[in-house]
Amino acid sequence: VTLPMIGNYLIHAASSHAGERGFGFNDMSERHTAWVLSRLAIEMKEYPTAFDKINLYTWIDEVGRLFTSRCFELADENGKTFGFARSIWAAIDVETRRPTLLDIEALGKYIDERPCPIEKPGKIMPAENKAEGIPYSIKYSDLDINGHFNSVKYIEHLLDLFDIDQFKTREIGRLEIAYQSEGKQGMPLTLHKAESAPDKQDMAICHEGKAICRA
C-alpha cells in the first residue's frame, strides 16, 4: 500500500464520517460551501501489504472559527497500529473561494478525546529557492470533483521527484504537506525538491514562482 493510496483512504473516510453527521459534501453544497484540506501530516510505523485488512478510524480533534482538525488511525484487524495522521480543514464559499465561519457548537458535539500521538503539522521551509523546478501542467486526470487539483495528486507528483529505486529499499516515515492555493486544469507548475537534513526533504509545487503547496 503506497502513501498516495493511504491519502485517498483518509480523504474518503473523512468524507464518509462528515456525511453521516450532517456536514458532508451534499450538506455543504446546499449551503454553497465546501470543505478544503489545508494541512495533512501522515506518520507511518509500517505500511500495510496489499493483503492486510485495514481498519481506519477518524475523529474530530478540535473546532475553531475558521478551521477544524481531524485525526486518523490505521490499524490491522488485530488492533496493531500501522500509523496515524492529522489534518486541518477549512470551509469555503464555493463562489468567492473565501473561508466561511464554522458552526462551532454543531461541530463541537463530535469532538473526540481519542489520542493521536504524532506531532501537529508545523512550519515547512521553502524548497523553491533551493532547487530548480521540473515543469508540469495540470491535466484532466489531476482534477477532483470540484474541478481543482486533487489533494492526493499533489502528493503523487511530489513523490515522482524521487528515484524509484529509493522506494525499493526505504519507506517514508512522515509526510507533511501544506496546501496554499488551488490548482486548475492547464495551470503550468514547477516541482521542487531539496534535501534540508539527512533523511529529510523539503518540496514545493509552484505556479509563476509562488508556492501552491509545500511538503
Question: Residue ranges of each PLM-predicted region?
Answer:
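Alpha-helix C-terminal capping segments
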Residues: 162, 193-194
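Short coil/loop residues immediately preceding or within conserved phosphate-binding loops
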Residues: 39, 69, 140, 174, ...
